[in-house]
């Protein structure tokens, strides 16, 4: 997942305004106590950041593939 795909997925799932707040301010334990933005800046793979953000916000598994990306086979 590219950063641009991550941003689209965040906007699609959470809405543009709320999504920006989440990635900038929500500290996620699964990301080492970092925000999504800080984790990406630290080199954490973007797909891993997306999955952690989804888990932290209770996004159902079937919606975690991200906008424009195929859902994983079950």
Tell what function each PLM region has.
Residues 1-74:
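C-terminal alpha-helical interaction appendages
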């Amino acid at each position: 997942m590219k950063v641009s795909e991550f941003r689209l997925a965040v906007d699609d799932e959470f809405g543009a305004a709320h999504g920006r707040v989440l990635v900038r301010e929500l500290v996620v334990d699964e990301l080492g106590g970092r925000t999504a933005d800080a984790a990406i800046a630290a080199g954490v793979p973007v797909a891993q950041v997306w999955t952690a953000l989804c888990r932290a916000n209770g996004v159902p598994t079937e919606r975690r593939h991200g906008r424009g990306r195929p859902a994983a086979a079950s």
